[in-house]
Amino acid sequence: MGDISPLTGTNGQIR
């Protein structure tokens, strides 16, 4: 449910 994304920070899902 949570992945490391450089766009959202540390926890965010790309929808």
Curated annotation (Swiss-Prot):
GO terms under biological process: hydrogen peroxide catabolic process
Subcellular locations according to the entry: Secreted
Cofactor note: Binds 1 heme b (iron(II)-protoporphyrin IX) group per subunit. Binds 2 calcium ions per subunit.
Top-level class of the enzyme under EC nomenclature: oxidoreductase
One CC-aspect GO term: extracellular region
Keyword field contains Oxidoreductase: yes
A single GO molecular function term of this UniProt record: lactoperoxidase activity
Record field: catalytic activity: 2 a phenolic donor + H2O2 = 2 a phenolic radical donor + 2 H2O
Keywords recorded for this protein, A-Z: Calcium, Heme, Hydrogen peroxide, Iron, Metal-binding, Oxidoreductase, Peroxidase, Secreted
Superkingdom to which the source organism belongs: Eukaryota
Cofactor: heme b; Ca(2+)
EC id: 1.11.1.7
Functional note: Removal of H(2)O(2), oxidation of toxic reductants, biosynthesis and degradation of lignin, suberization, auxin catabolism, response to environmental stresses such as wounding, pathogen attack and oxidative stress. These functions might be dependent on each isozyme/isoform in each plant tissue.
Family in the record: Belongs to the peroxidase family. Classical plant (class III) peroxidase subfamily.
Protein's UniProt name: Peroxidase 5
Naturally occurring in which organism (per UniProt): Capsicum annuum
